[in-house]
Design a protein with these regions (language model features):
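Pre-active-site segment of Zn-dependent metallo-hydrolases
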Residues: 10-15, 38-81, 92-97, 150-154, ...
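Metallo-beta-lactamase
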Residues: 2-18, 73, 77-88, 106-176, 236, 259-274, ...
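Conserved beta-strand hairpin/beta-sheet module of binuclear metal-dependent hydrolase folds
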Residues: 16-70, 157-182
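Active-site metal-binding loops of divalent metal-dependent hydrolases
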Residues: 44-46, 85, 145-148, 182-184, ...
């Protein structure tokens, strides 16, 4: 059953730009999304090169890159969308420096862990449940989509993970749909996404081919191409690659696989700190 809750954010703006939005790639799966005066941060990780995060069961991963900015350099945030509670998606810097009053939309498991750490506005979403966000004139909906962090025999040892669909609304335009895959592998439940949402404008693909004890737990190049074939986004941006030493499938592997599949015109690549701007399509006149 699909359920929806309402989140109303305080606003001081009298008017907002509801025609365009932007995504700035901070690094790993951390992206700064802006639309209509709403500022969203995804999967916040801000440790630096050579520093480590815990990935559970006494295992650690070392960062190979630096984030494009520090938490103190971010603009004022309205909310966080967190795919799951792993150290390379919510690290010790985020826990220490993020405002504890920020709403965090995430899995039920992650919300419980965050609330224990003082993030009292953590908002759990079950799969297919949504939160409608309002700030001034801006309207958007965040829906939790299926995700599975590993193969069936290993999934019970891994945290629950969700994909996210962000739908940005404007009275004069069609909704813009942004799909963030989260740290999922391809599995049958994902087939329901294109049935419910056949028109995805942009996808952020969590890649990297992460392997823990030899087990694949995030999409590699081949699975990334499979995701493109499944959800058929108009455009896609790869993220979550080359940033940690547990990532075994480099971006170059994905680029080669995308070219071989003939999807190169749909891909847009961002370096750390670079920004992608999107525009809502105007509705056809009646």
């Amino acid at each position: 059953m699909k359920t929806e809750t309402l989140l109303i954010l305080p606003s001081k703006e009298r008017s907002a730009n509801l025609e365009t939005g932007s995504l700035q790639f901070i690094g790993n799966a951390t992206v700064l999304i802006r639309f209509g005066g709403v500022t969203i941060l995804t999967d916040p990780t801000f440790i630096h090169r050579h520093e480590r995060v815990s990935i559970g069961y006494g295992l650690h991963s070392t960062r190979l890159t630096d984030p494009a900015m520090e938490i103190g350099e971010l603009p004022p945030l309205d909310l966080v969308v967190l795919s799951h509670f792993h150290g390379d998606h919510f690290d010790q810097v985020a826990e220490r420096e993020l405002d504890k009053s920020l709403p965090i939309v995430t899995t039920r498991e992650a919300a419980t862990a965050l609330q224990r750490r003082g993030f009292r506005q953590s908002k759990p979403l079950d799969t297919w449940a949504s939160v409608a966000v309002e700030k001034g004139e801006a309207r958007l909906r965040i829906t939790a989509l299926p995700g599975r962090h590993g193969p069936p025999f290993a999934d019970l040892l891994l945290p629950d993970v969700m994909g996210s669909l962000l739908e940005f609304h404007s009275p004069q335009a069609q909704p813009f749909r942004l799909y963030i895959t989260g740290d999922t592998l391809l599995f049958d439940d994902l087939k329901e996404i294109p049935r419910r949402y056949p028109a995805i404008d942009l996808a952020l693909l969590h890649l990297g081919g992460t392997r823990v004890l030899g087990i694949l737990v995030t999409m590699d190049a081949e699975q990334g191409v499979g995701m493109m074939k499944l959800v058929r986004p108009l455009r896609a941006i790869p993220i979550h690659y080359n940033d940690y030493d547990v990532f075994k499938s480099p971006l170059t592997d994905f680029q080669q696989a995308i070219d071989a599949a003939g999807f190169q015109d749909r891909l847009h690549y961002l370096r750390h700190g670079e920004t992608y701007t999107f525009r809502l399509s105007r509705q056809a006149a009646a």
